[in-house]
């Protein structure tokens, strides 16, 4: 008989991607909720990572990765490429003042700064691969949130035995706050997210995702013209 020595197998406590073991950072929902100063904005969360800096315009979340430009970043939501995931976006950039996504419906984010996966091409600086949560087949769940700039409502549940859904709607109150402070502009935004999944068979699932936002900017005509207002608008 042949004797075989004993072997001890221990799992690694760290989740590593086989395709991009070094250049990918995995952001969980707990990271999104607990990182201070980010206001649950997924673009602001990664600013503490090596090689990542922000636009010098303080109120925007444009990403500058490894010396690249703000337009060289690509975003994916459940494998679908999205040009920009922010409100009040500008042409030639990938950022904005606030994210269009409700973080309550995000399950995980993979942030690549190099060695991009073959099925996530089209970027020069970085890729942010966002995975949404799935609906709940056993119950209906609702959540209301009050953020620094908006109020929102999200829902997760099921429609029948084979269809699940997630949904979110948010409305900003910045226009009221800016008017109260006497600022010359009054920004306002609305966004919504809807995802439905229907199980057609054991191996096939139909998925529909809808994402949209409306941005509005008005001048506060109820204040007097002064040097401070002219400076802010310039």
Predicted regions and their residues:
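Outer-membrane beta-barrel channels and translocator barrels
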Residues: 106, 137, 160-162, 199-203
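Flexible loop and strand-edge segments within Gram-negative outer membrane beta-barrel domains
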Residues: 174, 205-234
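Transmembrane beta-barrel strands of outer-membrane/channel proteins
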Residues: 6, 142-148, 167-173, 208-214
């Amino acid at each position: 008989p042949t004797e075989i020595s004993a072997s001890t197998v221990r799992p690694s406590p760290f989740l590593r991607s086989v395709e991009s073991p070094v250049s990918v950072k995995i952001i969980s929902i707990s990271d999104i909720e607990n990182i201070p100063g980010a206001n649950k904005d997924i673009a602001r969360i990664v600013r503490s990572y090596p090689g990542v800096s922000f636009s010098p315009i303080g109120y925007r979340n444009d990403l500058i990765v490894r010396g690249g430009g703000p337009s060289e970043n690509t975003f994916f939501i459940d494998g679908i490429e999205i040009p920009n995931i922010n409100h009040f976006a500008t042409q030639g950039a990938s950022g904005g003042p606030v994210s269009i996504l409700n973080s309550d419906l995000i399950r995980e984010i993979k942030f690549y700064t190099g060695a991009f996966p073959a099925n996530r091409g089209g970027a020069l600086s970085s890729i942010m691969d966002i995975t949404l949560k799935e609906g709940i087949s056993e119950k209906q769940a609702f959540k209301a949130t009050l953020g620094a700039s908006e109020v929102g409502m999200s829902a997760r549940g099921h429609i029948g035995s084979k269809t699940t859904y997630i949904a979110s709607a948010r409305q900003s109150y910045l226009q009221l706050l800016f008017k109260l402070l006497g600022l010359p502009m009054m920004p306002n935004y609305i966004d919504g997210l809807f995802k439905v999944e229907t199980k057609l068979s054991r191996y096939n699932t139909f998925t529909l995702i809808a994402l949209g936002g409306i941005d509005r900017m008005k001048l506060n005509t109820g204040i007097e013209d002064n040097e401070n207002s002219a400076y802010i608008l310039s």
